[in-house]
Structure formats: structure tokens, C-alpha cells
A protein has these predicted regions:
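Active-site beta3 strand of CheY-like receiver
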Residues: 48-54
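Acidic catalytic/metal-coordinating carboxylates
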Residues: 37-40, 63-69
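Receiver (REC) domain active-site loop signature in two-component systems and cognate sites
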Residues: 59
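Conserved phosphotransfer cores of two-component systems
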Residues: 46-48, 72-80, 101
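Alpha4 helix (beta4-alpha4-beta5 surface) of REC/receiver domains from two-component response regulators
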Residues: 66, 90-105
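Conserved sequence signature across two-component system core domains
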Residues: 9-10, 35, 53
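Two-component/phosphorelay signaling modules centered on CheY-like receiver
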Residues: 13-33
């Protein structure tokens, strides 16, 4: 069975470490990249084309919403990843914005 490729982005190193450990313990997942900001994640997505991207909404350089919007408009990708967004802010407008930009979860 093909493992799902996953990329993760968060500006909090502790969150990145937790996510990396969770992914590495699951035999069906394979970590293909991690980033501390949205600009790095955008480049990882273009290069690696992961199946799943877990990303924070509030990050430096590009926020998670901007990353999703740019990827949605990217013509050279063979496929768009499934986005799972993380945020410490529980505002409904942020959640709605994430789903409108392409978030799956």
C-alpha cells in the first residue's frame, strides 16, 4: 500500500516536533517536508506535491490562508493537496475563510 505523503508547517517548533512524531509513528504516512513559515511551505508543496498539508493559519511571510490560495491558483501542480489547518484562534470567520480557501479539516 502506498503511504500518504505529508508536509507540515507551523511557526512554533514544539508543534512541529509533535506533528513530526505523530506522523513518524504512523506506518501509512510519510513526512516529506516541514517549514516554519508559509513561504517555505509554499515551495515544499510545489516541489514535493504532498497528499496532505497540515499548516498553521498564523505564520510569518505567508499565512496559511495565503498558502492555500496560492496553491489553488498554481497551474503546474498535478494535484492539490488536502489541507488540514491548525490555529489557536477559535474565531468562526477564520474557520470559514480556511474552508473557502480549500481546507479539508
Amino acid at each position: 500500500m502506498k503511504r500518504l505523503s505529508v508536509a507540515i508547517a507551523d511557526d512554533n517548533d514544539q508543534i512541529l516536533e509533535i506533528l513530526e512524531n505523530l506522523i513518524n509513528t504512523d506506518k501509512e504516512l510519510h513526512l516529506v517536508g516541514k517549514a516554519n513559515n508559509g513561504e517555505e511551505m509554499y515551495e515544499i508543496i510545489k516541489e514535493k506535491e504532498p497528499d496532505i498539508v497540515i499548516l498553521d493559519i498564523f505564520m510569518p511571510k505567508l499565512d496559511g490562508l495565503e498558502v492555500m490560495e496560492r496553491i489553488k491558483e498554481e497551474k503546474e501542480l498535478k494535484k492539490n493537496p488536502n489541507f488540514i489547518v491548525l490555529t489557536a484562534v477559535g474565531q468562526e470567520r477564520i474557520t470559514q475563510a480556511a474552508f473557502s480557501k480549500g481546507a479539508s479539516y
